Amino acid sequence: MGNGGADSRNDPQRQGTRRTFAPWTDPTARALVRFDGVSKQFAAVAAVERVSLDIFPGEFFALLGPSGCGKTTLLRLLAGLDTPDEGRILLDGEDIAPVPPYRRPINMMFQSYALFPHLTVEGNVAFGLKQEGLPKTEITARVEEMLALVRLEGLGKRKPHQLSGGQRQRVALARSLVKRPRVLLLDEPLAALDKKLRGETQFELMQLQERLGLTFVIVTHDQQEAMTVADRIGVMDHGRLIQVATPPEIYERPNSRWVADFIGEVNLIEGRVVDVGASETVIASAAAGRLRALSPTDAKPGDVVGVALRPEKVRIAHAPPPTGGENCVAGQVGNIGYLGDLSVYKVRLDNGIVMKAAVANVTRLVERPIGWDDRVWLSWAPEAAMVLTR
């Protein structure tokens, strides 16, 4: 097997913005990792069920889902820590079933970091290289290179208990990378960090992955984390892949009510399709009247569908919009959540359903024009409505 990192690092597409990196759209592109109908069962529980997935060289891929959905099991199968009951896992076209974990060019960074408390930072990073019996001079050079890469120069002689949580996370990352794997697996790597540090570290991970050109696969239940770092996201539930797409596609074009509800905040309105045009779908809803959506759909007249609306795409005002009664509902403000950058209004419609509208706080310390118990109108553009058939 060749060096997957070098290939992707020299890819002119990869050297531009992350948006230009899209090998999954190229039918001739070859996957580095392929799950082919993989299943894994523990007792009577199907942890992973018939998963097929391609991950490409140089890709930052996120497995996202609630606890117990099978994402960590999928990671362990790739690492060789568990064995599939069905299906194959290929690395660069070769079935890796016969290859033991320590022979696979794959490293895994665990949520707990698993640092050796009796070893220094340098000792922890060098541990795997010493196990391989590399010359001392090479070990020293590679450890120094990794510590510089993760910005831990000058801390090599410290023990783990003398480091902050963020520094321990970097030591674990350096130890995972020092053996130069083709694929790095990250199991909830930022879960132990506070929110601010977690946000900063997400961008550091992205920059590091871009610089090295390696394939990263991260497991997380944090939607914001997955949306921030990943080129693509695989959303999992009950052992199955529900949708695989880029972060904007997952957010703006979810393939089901479940994905729409799991990724961020959403208003879901049930209705029945009245008409399907070339670019527009008309829905009749008992909750919200007549709705128009500029959303691609395979729905037919008479089908029951869900209409998903992100709160930030819903306008809130004291007066109805001049466009008329379509895509417009009236209600009363029941609650207001101030989130700093946003204010979220919970509005109880006349039929009892609650919808949310999110408004950016673009001015400072200005009294809200809309308050509790106000009578308001919610409206949205047709392109803001997503039609979901399942």
Listing of model-derived features with the role each one plays in the protein:
Residues G2-P12, F21, V266, V276-R390:
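Non-catalytic connector elements of ABC transporters
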Residues A79:
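Helix-to-loop junction immediately C-terminal to a conserved catalytic motif
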Residues D85-R88, E138, H238, E270:
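Conserved coupling/switch loops of ABC nucleotide-binding domains, chiefly the family-specific signature
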